């Protein structure tokens, strides 16, 4: 008879969790930041608010965003005008849209990741799904499992309303699942659609206006597993360690409240300072065991909460400008997609490394860090180890 210890050892993988494939997807509808103020004030019937529109246009200009992809169209707003009002009861119709579209967009990213991975979907043992939108039972994880035709025995984890730090949360969760279940292959999906947060402008809610200028829709999927079979799987990044912390006395710094009017967004002006003053402590705790204290020796995947946050972190840590290039590129091309952002940046990082003929998937560097920042104020820190590039 096997002992409990023997059973536990047999259940565990030998090596670290590894990202084996990445897929991303966006809605078709694209909005350009240069004329978004005109579009936004027109579709919300707010063109009479001329001074506020000028202020919003300045916010858009400073956002460092070129374009975003958004599921919500002008035709949908014409059909459901309460969504475009500032504070009108609209949760029911928002839910009707989101509970269908969030899993559908997640499916698009998941299929791309599965195709890159190249293995039968029957080998997916676990599913981790994350979204800030559309709470229901059974959840988006159940819907996605059915849309993809996964095994009925797939072990599911559903994460709702985590917010912008959750790209780190899903990787931390997938790491624990992969390393504690030998042979596990974890499909991780983040799918975000801003139908739940879209609303018209108000003079009394400038933080809401900031959100309207920043957020975009997108989904990203990764497949995570330990002990990859390199004859049929292509490792991209190892997940070496993962930690979460929250900054004391900052519960309201980034917040969302689900109400009859949808999900309202609240933001303190000092969020960039709060994050930049606490990020080095997270780095030190994560990299001390590795003897690393030069933050410019790392490749960087940082959630792009907005340009002010990136600028503050860059200045506080004396980072070279090129360190946040991949992060700024994703912000520019897609906006802030909440939990999906860091997975988009991982994808950009490995593609950029391949195109630039770098030695590793981390722009030629061995070690990297992935940061998620969000409500709480919560910081997720994931230590990454890159993989030598395959040239064929």
From Swiss-Prot:
Span of the secretion signal?
Answer: none
Give induction info.
By stress.
A Gene Ontology cellular component where this protein is annotated is: cytoplasm
- One GO BP: defense response
Task: Name where it's found.
Answer: Cytoplasm
Q: Which GO terms describe its molecular function?
A: acyltransferase activity, transferring groups other than amino-acyl groups; trihydroxystilbene synthase activity
Binding positions (substrate) = 55-58, 267, 305-307
- First-tier enzyme category under EC: transferase
According to the UniProt entry, what is the EC number of this protein? 2.3.1.95
**Catalytic reaction annotation:** 4-coumaroyl-CoA + 3 malonyl-CoA + 3 H(+) = trans-resveratrol + 4 CO2 + 4 CoA
Q: Which family does it belong to?
A: Belongs to the thiolase-like superfamily. Chalcone/stilbene synthases family.
How is the subunit organization of this protein annotated in UniProt? Homodimer.
Name used for this protein in its record: Stilbene synthase 3
């Amino acid at each position: 008879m096997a002992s409990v210890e023997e059973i536990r050892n047999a259940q565990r993988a030998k090596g670290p969790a590894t990202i084996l494939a990445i897929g991303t997807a966006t809605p078709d509808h694209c909005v350009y930041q240069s004329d978004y103020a005109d579009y936004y004030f027109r579709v919300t019937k707010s063109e009479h608010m001329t001074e506020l529109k000028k202020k919003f246009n300045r916010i858009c200009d400073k956002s460092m965003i070129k374009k975003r992809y958004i599921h919500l169209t002008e035709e949908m707003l014409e059909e459901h005008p309460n969504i475009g009002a500032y504070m009108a009861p609209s949760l029911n119709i928002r839910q009707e849209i989101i509970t269908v579209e969030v899993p559908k967009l997640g499916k698009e990213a998941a299929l791309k990741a599965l195709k890159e991975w190249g293995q039968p979907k029957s080998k997916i043992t676990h599913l981790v799904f994350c979204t800030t939108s559309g709470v229901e039972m059974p959840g988006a994880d159940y819907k996605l499992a059915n849309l993809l035709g996964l095994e009925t025995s797939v072990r599911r984890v559903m994460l709702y309303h985590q917010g912008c730090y959750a790209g780190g949360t899903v990787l931390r969760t997938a790491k624990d699942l992969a390393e504690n279940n030998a042979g596990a292959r974890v499909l991780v999906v983040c799918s975000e659609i801003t139908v739940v947060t879209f609303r018209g402008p108000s003079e009394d809610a400038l933080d809401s206006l900031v959100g309207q200028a920043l957020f975009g829709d997108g989904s990203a999927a990764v497949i995570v597993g330990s002990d990859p079979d390199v004859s049929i799987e292509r490792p991209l990044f190892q997940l070496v360690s993962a930690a979460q912390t929250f900054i004391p006395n900052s519960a309201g710094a980034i917040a969302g409240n689900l109400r009859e009017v949808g999900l309202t967004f609240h933001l303190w002006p000092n969020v960039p300072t709060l994050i930049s003053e606490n990020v080095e402590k997270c780095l030190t705790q994560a990299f001390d065991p590795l003897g690393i204290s030069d933050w410019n020796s790392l490749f960087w995947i940082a959630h792009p909460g907005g340009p002010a946050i990136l600028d503050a972190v860059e200045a506080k840590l004396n980072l070279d400008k090129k360190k946040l290039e991949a992060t700024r590129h994703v912000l520019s091309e897609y906006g802030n997609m909440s939990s999906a952002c860091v997975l988009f940046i991982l994808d950009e990082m490995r593609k950029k490394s391949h195109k630039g003929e770098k030695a590793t998937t981390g722009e030629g560097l061995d070690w990297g860090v992935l940061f998620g920042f969000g409500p709480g104020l919560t910081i997720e820190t994931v230590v990454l180890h890159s993989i030598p590039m395959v040239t064929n």
